[in-house]
Amino acid sequence: MAELKNDRYLRALLKQPVDRTPVWMMRQAGRYLPEYKATRAEAGDFMSLCKNQDLACEVTLQPLRRYDLDAAILFSDILTVPDAMGLGLYFETGEGPRFERPTDTIDSIKKLCIPDPEDELGYVMRAVSTIRRELKGEVPLIGFSGSPWTLATYMVEGGSSKTFEKIKKMAYEEPATLHMLLDKLADSVILYLNAQVANGAQSLMIFDSWGGALSHHAYREFSLRYMQKIVDGLTRHADGRQVPVTLFTKGGGLWLESMAETGCDALGLDWTVDIGDARRRVGNKVALQGNMDPSVLYASPERIHQEVEQILSSYGEGTGHVFNLGHGIHQHVNPEHAGSFINSVHELSGKYHK
């Protein structure tokens, strides 16, 4: 593997000194870029794009050709794991992901097999190794997975949901059944993420997109417990370096202290959290990633500049901050505004690292 030329992102996650705040964007390879749309059209559909290692590599690299980013993130989808379990993932126009065979009974959960990451998910591993090779050491590669709770919401509901009625009903009426599913998913995610590291991922992120839908006690029981299990089971060193782990619960501002106790290296923050307050609460234990509202990118470059300065100022001096959006970039954002955001972070952050 090529020697890493820019390790700013990895150093910030490990709270080591950096010259400026590193920056990347969730969904930085995505529909806001015309070149992404062209490659997706070439692939035919979303999952065909994910399953073609060369095209997945191409879209991963596209934002790095445009912007001065400090990390690349594997182009894939959190639902690759349940798809590999045989649920029959497909996408309905305007409705998002759906499963042909939801896992909403104890019998269906018992039948689930833990997928072999080098077999059923081999296309992801081939993409990881291809991307790592093609990056040529320019920036680190982030691997990722959905959290067990978030994956389970799609599996039990049969797709996207606004109310999570089916899975919450299961949580309160048949908690042992849900725990069986979450335990299988945690085991699957551990294997999946460790295989990503073995194939070249240099940092890992767990997306708990729907943890914020849970009550205080339910979050600990059904989400955090299984992210803890994953953190405990992950490969944390590869290529002579530590492999940092970031946990991100959207809507998880109430639970930062509990998340920081898991032994992860960093926490992702959504835009509802004040990053300065978060640093006071948990900054002695973990680095922080975030957390500009993605909608700010609809504003003028001048306003984007102001918002970046406000977040940098709130975090304050020193390392331990990876700048990002508070969630994925919106598909209708002007790509030039994304560039203004990234340039603003690099231009403004140097004074906080002297």
Swiss-Prot record:
Protein EC: 4.1.1.37
GO molecular function: uroporphyrinogen decarboxylase activity
Catalytic reaction list: uroporphyrinogen III + 4 H(+) = coproporphyrinogen III + 4 CO2
Record site feature (Transition state stabilizer), residues: D77
InterPro entries: UROD/MetE-like_sf (IPR038071), Uroporphyrinogen_deCO2ase_HemE (IPR006361), Uroporphyrinogen_deCOase (IPR000257)
Keywords from the UniProt entry: Cytoplasm, Decarboxylase, Lyase, Porphyrin biosynthesis
Disulfide bonds: none
A GO CC term assigned to this protein in UniProt: cytosol
This protein's pathway: Porphyrin-containing compound metabolism; protoporphyrin-IX biosynthesis; coproporphyrinogen-III from 5-aminolevulinate: step 4/4
Subunit-structure text: Homodimer.
Function: Catalyzes the decarboxylation of four acetate groups of uroporphyrinogen-III to yield coproporphyrinogen-III.
PANTHER family on file: METHYLTETRAHYDROFOLATE:HOMOCYSTEINE METHYLTRANSFERASE RELATED, UROPORPHYRINOGEN DECARBOXYLASE
NCBIfam families reported for this sequence: hemE
HAMAP family associated with the record: URO_D
Protein name, entry field: Uroporphyrinogen decarboxylase
Taxonomy of the source species: Bacteria, Pseudomonadati, Pseudomonadota, Gammaproteobacteria, Alteromonadales
Gene: hemE
